[in-house]
């Protein structure tokens, strides 16, 4: 049995993860963490299911006793702090937060030298299949096709572009032998001249209640290939995170992603 702690347990993602962990074979919810205001409430009741006998606390350190894995959907600042605490306690970690700064990523990487960490910009199984499709398409189509990425999310999303859009650009750039730092273009405005052939554009849209949509365009002469993933609910992100928790328990220290969880890396 894998003992799981969920951070952000009263949020939209957290409540879904609590429900899925409670229903999952081989997993047991042993801790739930949320900001002050929810402490003492039963995690199951907060998630809309029968009580689980797990009281919400407002400090991760107080929930780690006996834990095997923490599933973290908070913020990049909180996730970096939580990674350091999990490393101190020897508890594996699944991170689904986005919007990481280079400094926060470095803190997570340092923690992964001591514990196993699944760190992925998107926990959806479908999106991770999209990563592989983009990699293969870029290799086959090569420099003869221009690559552009468009993402749209709900108006409350704080970071832009999405971590998934950036990752898609990095995947395409890597497959084409380009440095993402040079190739990815996030802003276009004014008279810029002809599009550089090495460039990969990443465009952001925000509005309404869109859960998430990503399209990668491969634009050639006389044809265009579009690869799209549309999320219609957040449940697929939660399902991926719970799957990652079952995968990472007992693994050696290191930085893993959903390609490892889904066995996609070994299939390349």
Curated annotation (Swiss-Prot):
GO MF annotation: an example: NADP binding
EC class of the enzyme, as a word: oxidoreductase
Positions with a binding annotation for NADP(+): 35
One Gene Ontology cellular component: cytosol
Annotated EC: 1.17.1.8
Sequence positions that bind NAD(+): 8-13, 34, 96-98, 120-123
Location within or outside the cell: Cytoplasm
Role according to the record: Catalyzes the conversion of 4-hydroxy-tetrahydrodipicolinate (HTPA) to tetrahydrodipicolinate.
Keyword NAD: yes
NAD listed as a keyword: yes
Domain of life: Bacteria
Transmembrane segment boundaries: none
The reaction(s) this protein catalyses: (S)-2,3,4,5-tetrahydrodipicolinate + NAD(+) + H2O = (2S,4S)-4-hydroxy-2,3,4,5-tetrahydrodipicolinate + NADH + H(+); (S)-2,3,4,5-tetrahydrodipicolinate + NADP(+) + H2O = (2S,4S)-4-hydroxy-2,3,4,5-tetrahydrodipicolinate + NADPH + H(+)
Pfam families reported for this sequence: DapB_C (PF05173), DapB_N (PF01113)
Keywords, comma-separated and alphabetical: Amino-acid biosynthesis, Cytoplasm, Diaminopimelate biosynthesis, Lysine biosynthesis, NAD, NADP, Oxidoreductase
Pathway: Amino-acid biosynthesis; L-lysine biosynthesis via DAP pathway; (S)-tetrahydrodipicolinate from L-aspartate: step 4/4
InterPro entries named among the record's database cross-references: DapB_C, DapB_N, DapB_N_CS, DHDPR_bac, NAD(P)-bd_dom_sf
A GO biological process held by the record: lysine biosynthetic process via diaminopimelate
Name this protein carries in UniProt: 4-hydroxy-tetrahydrodipicolinate reductase
Family statement drawn from the similarity comment of this UniProt entry: Belongs to the DapB family.
Cross-referenced SUPFAM superfamilies: Glyceraldehyde-3-phosphate dehydrogenase-like, C-terminal domain, NAD(P)-binding Rossmann-fold domains
UniProt source species: Anaeromyxobacter sp. (strain Fw109-5)
Residues annotated to bind (S)-2,3,4,5-tetrahydrodipicolinate: 154, 163-164
